[in-house]
Amino acid sequence: MAQRMGLYLQDKHDIKYELQIAQYAEEKGFSEIWQADTRLARDCIVMMSALLTHTSRIKIGSGVLPIYTRNPAVIAASWSTMWELAGLTPDGESRVMLGLGAWWEPIASRVGADRRSPLKAMRENIEAIRALFTMEEISYEGEFVQLDHVKLDVAYGSTDPRNIPIYIGATGPKMLQLSGEICDGPVLNYVVSTDYIKDAVGQVEIGAQRSGREISAIDRPELLACSLSDDD
């Protein structure tokens, strides 16, 4: 797997400046940008759309979108729209990536989100979204997701399948395993020890084996905190 370098954007800078950062990152060969959406600050879909229209090659992903804030069909429609907006990379891959998370406390309970059974809720959301990305009509009956003959009803745009990679912002062992089992991979956390990362990758591998895949086939982007200075 080729070494890559990306950026993780939150809301630390003026929006116009962050768009300039994205253009600079693309010019310098960065592979991707992940836009945060865990706080009630900047909406990742709005920011991702802006980043996509101000760049032409770099990949843009959500890092990560809480599954409790939107219906999975709406999530699929939003990412399908960004897929059309962005076009493909020079290698023919989707420029847009979908990172999903189970949100966190206390913000979730403060807005009335019911985070029970996050593992099951995550599985159902990903299965439904992945099915909708085929552009076929689907029905899904789960505890958290119910879809009755639903499809991405694109009338004038491309109806090609949306080969959009899906990631989980996973921290615990079971969610890490799920990311290896049904996703393109996890988005690994930052400000953690190397021992934690080694164990996390081991959990991802357990999940990958359940679906008959090798760990080498699982993408594993990791967030890193760093401080830059003009001084040597």
Indicate where each model-derived feature is located.
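Hydrophobic faces of well-ordered beta-strands that scaffold small-molecule active sites
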Residues: M5-L9, I33-Q35, I60-G63, V96-L100, ...
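Active-site pocket-lining/capping segments in soluble small-molecule metabolic enzymes
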Residues: D232
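Conserved strand-to-helix beginnings and helix N-cap segments that scaffold or border functional pockets
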Residues: E18-L19, I45, P72-A76, K198
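Active-site-proximal loop/turn and secondary-structure-junction residues that shape catalytic pockets
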Residues: D11-H13, R39, P66-Y68, A102-P106, ...
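Glycine-/proline-rich flexible loop or hinge segments
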Residues: S31-W34, I58-I67, I107-V111
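N-terminal beta1-alpha1-beta2 module of alpha/beta enzyme domains
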Residues: M1-I60, I164
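Internal, glycine-rich beta/alpha segment that forms the wall or movable "lid"
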Residues: V74-G185, Y190-I218
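Active-site mouth loops of central-metabolism enzymes
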Residues: Q3-K16, L65-P72, P161-T171, C226-S229
